[in-house]
């Protein structure tokens, strides 16, 4: 795992198309902004896990 330190307003790039920017920090909570092409899905981990479970329950698609 790569560990990075960023300040508010600073970004990191994933490949050529995905940019993640630190928007704010309040206590132990960090607000991130994500710029990515529309064809790349961006989900919080807990939402992605639910999507996977639903897909496993309904494999018709």
From Swiss-Prot:
Function text: A key translational regulator that binds mRNA to regulate translation initiation and/or mRNA stability. Mediates global changes in gene expression, shifting from rapid growth to stress survival by linking envelope stress, the stringent response and the catabolite repression systems. Usually binds in the 5'-UTR; binding at or near the Shine-Dalgarno sequence prevents ribosome-binding, repressing translation, binding elsewhere in the 5'-UTR can activate translation and/or stabilize the mRNA. Its function is antagonized by small RNA(s).
Check the record and name the PANTHER family matching this protein: CARBON STORAGE REGULATOR
> Subcellular localization, per the record?
Cytoplasm
User: What keywords are assigned to this protein?
Assistant: Activator, Cytoplasm, Repressor, RNA-binding, Translation regulation
Protein name, entry field: Translational regulator CsrA
Per UniProt, what is one GO molecular function of this protein?
mRNA 5'-UTR binding
Where does this chain mainly localize? Answer: cytoplasm
Query: What Pfam families does its record include?
Result: CsrA (PF02599)
Task: Give GO cellular component annotations, separated by semicolons.
Answer: cytosol
Superkingdom to which the source organism belongs: Bacteria
The record ties this protein, via Gene3D superfamilies, to:
Translational regulator CsrA (2.60.40.4380)
